């Protein structure tokens, strides 16, 4: 069931509008507010053009842009409660639609955060997340320290947000699903060389966790004519691609998902109920399944002793090669 990608919503459907936002050019503080206002116009237009949309999702970097020369300029960063978010929250309230947004956020205690915020249809913040796995060494952001939150959304959705490179680590989607998420949003700024990995991880994150994944990247050229991919994608709970976008800047790609289907599958599937079976290994032979943790990497991570066999030979261990200098120097100025 697709309901014509949300034109005729199935009962219980969550209709998504994934915006392949044009890469913005940010040169001065006023550009941030102007960009937020442009995105707010897209939010209002999407809801007006397709009133069935419940949630509009903007990609990573859609306010702050992709120019690394601006990323540690304190005047070109945002605040969680700053004017840019006020504009976007106002658009959600006016249009009566939920929204998911991205900001590069000031951090008085260190390197900036790469943050995502979900706003409901009354303009209230419902989820706040800091990217846990920055795309090192290219990105200078502080690693998120708040875990992966989950919030209630429209139509029975339990929403989680992971950002860009987060989705390349299967543990991230697994954690979101383990905490109850049945719809996992993924926002990104990826360019075309990452296209294949983007597709397979979006599908795998859905299948491995019996969750819908809804993912979108920036689109169009940056100042050097390097294009972000767009490539909005919604995957069913079995990993099947329901809807896939292209590279068109500012295209709103729509799709419907039915959160109750994910909930039901998690209860009724036998084979391939992987998120349950991870903690109940071999339950056909062992009452309740084996409940131990046989994974060395998990044990070492918990103990603070995570170390790959080739650790001493890894070439890139800080951002110096990407021009950021040693970690102690990575601060907004």
Question: Where on the chain are the PLM-derived regions?
Answer:
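Cys-nucleophile CN-hydrolase/nitrilase-fold catalytic domain and related Cys-dependent amidase chemistry
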Residues: 33-122, 126-128, 191-209
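Short beta->alpha transition motifs characteristic of CBS
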Residues: 69-71, 117, 128-135, 233, ...
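C-terminal beta-strand edge segments of enzyme domains
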Residues: 3, 150, 217-333
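Eukaryotic scaffold repeat domains enriched in small/polar residues
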Residues: 30-35, 46-48, 94, 98, ...
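CN hydrolase (nitrilase-like) catalytic-core segments centered on the catalytic cysteine
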Residues: 83-99, 158, 168-256
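A short, flexible beta-alpha/helix-coil linker loop
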Residues: 21-26, 63-64, 69, 220
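N-terminal active-site segment of His-dependent metallophosphoesterases
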Residues: 1-55, 185
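Active-site catalytic loop in hydrolytic enzyme cores
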Residues: 107-182, 187-204, 228
């Amino acid at each position: 069931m697709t309901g014509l990608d949300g034109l005729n919503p199935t009962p219980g459907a969550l209709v998504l509008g994934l915006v392949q936002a044009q890469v913005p050019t940010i040169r001065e503080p006023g550009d941030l507010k102007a960009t937020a206002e442009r995105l707010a116009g897209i939010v209002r237009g999407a809801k007006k053009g397709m009133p069935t949309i419940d949630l509009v999702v903007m990609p990573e970097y859609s306010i702050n842009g992709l120019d690394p020369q601006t990323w540690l300029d304190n005047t070109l960063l945002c605040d969680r409660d700053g004017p840019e978010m006020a504009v976007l929250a106002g658009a959600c309230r006016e249009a009566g639609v939920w929204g998911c947004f991205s900001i590069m956020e000031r951090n008085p205690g260190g390197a900036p955060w790469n943050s995502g915020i979900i706003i409901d249809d009354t303009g209230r913040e419902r989820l706040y997340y800091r990217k846990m796995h920055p795309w090192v060494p290219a990105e200078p952001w502080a690693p998120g320290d708040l875990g992966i939150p989950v919030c209630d959304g429209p139509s029975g959705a339990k929403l989680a947000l992971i950002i860009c490179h987060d989705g390349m680590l299967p543990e991230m989607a697994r954690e979101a699903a383990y905490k109850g998420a049945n719809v996992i949003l993924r926002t990104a700024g990826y360019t075309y060389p990452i296209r294949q990995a983007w597709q397979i991880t979006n599908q795998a994150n859905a299948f491995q966790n019996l969750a819908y994944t809804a993912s979108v990247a920036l689109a169009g050229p940056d100042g050097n004519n390097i294009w972000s991919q767009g490539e909005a994608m919604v995957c069913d709970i079995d990993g099947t691609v329901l809807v896939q976008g292209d590279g068109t800047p500012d295209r709103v790609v729509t799709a419907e998902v039915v959160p109750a289907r994910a909930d039901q599958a998690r209860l009724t599937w036998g084979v391939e109920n992987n998120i349950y079976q991870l903690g109940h290994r071999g339950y056909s032979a062992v009452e309740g399944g084996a409940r131990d943790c046989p994974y060395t990497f998990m044990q070492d991570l918990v103990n603070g002793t995570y170390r790959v066999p080739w650790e001493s030979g890894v070439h890139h261990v800080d951002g110096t090669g990407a021009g950021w200098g040693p970690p102690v120097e990575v601060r907004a100025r």
